[in-house]
Regions:
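Fold-independent oxyanion-binding glycine-rich loops
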Residues: 14, 23-24, 52, 60-61, ...
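The conserved cystathionine-beta-synthase
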Residues: 1-5, 11-12, 164-169
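Protease-associated
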Residues: 36-96
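Feature captures the catalytic cores and cofactor-binding loops of soluble hydro-lyases/lyases
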Residues: 73-158
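Internal, active-site/partner-interface "lid" segment
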Residues: 43-47, 159-164
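Helix-turn-helix/homeodomain-like alpha-helical modules used for DNA recognition
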Residues: 2-5, 21, 51, 58
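Short beta->alpha transition motifs characteristic of CBS
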Residues: 6, 10, 16-33, 139
Length: 169
């Protein structure tokens, strides 16, 4: 949109207008994104997260939706992590085995492992058993945390109501 200097675009599905998306709809949402649950509120597909983070889905269903929980960065030791990770959270973390294990044991719905760090077979098996999606990204934790909200579907931003339309004769 920026490159073409377009400020409004129609959102269509099968040649039918679904809504309208403006640059300000997107920027307002990102600038006011103090809500750590916005990714789940938007019902974001895991495949969108994988694409946005230029990552790989290691465990889980890419067509599934992230629908409950907050997004957080695990930047503490596991003892402290236990106090702030809740069931269904999406946890962005690094290569520390203990942090990955803690997030899964605290019933996170998804862990995003940064810097392309390897994920051990034990962590993969436990994640599979517990239904925890595992995504690997080459990005560092700061970049992953910055970009992850860009994976939200446009349907979350677009305006659907009170659209004035017309047809050509």
């Amino acid at each position: 949109m920026k490159d073409e200097r377009v400020v409004t675009v129609p959102v269509v599905n099968r040649k039918r207008l679904e809504g309208v998306l403006t640059v300000s709809d997107i920027t307002d949402s990102f600038m006011e994104a103090y809500d750590s649950e916005i990714l789940s509120t938007a019902h974001t597909r895991y495949c969108n997260i994988v694409d946005t983070l230029e990552g790989k889905l290691l465990i889980g269903d890419e067509k599934a939706y992230y629908t409950k929980g907050k997004v957080l960065v695990a930047a503490a030791n596991p003892d402290l992590m236990e106090s702030y990770i809740s069931k269904h959270d999406l946890v962005i973390l690094g290569n520390r085995y203990e942090s990955q294990l803690c997030a899964i044991e605290m019933e996170a719905d998804c862990i995003v492992v940064c810097e392309g760090a390897p994920v051990s077979l034990t962590i993969r098996k436990l994640a599979q058993e517990r239904g925890c999606t595992v995504i690997s990204t080459p990005f560092d934790t700061f970049t992953a945390a910055r970009f992850i909200n860009q994976s939200m579907p446009i349907s979350y931003f677009m305006k659907r109501d009170h659209l004035i339309t017309f047809e050509e004769d």
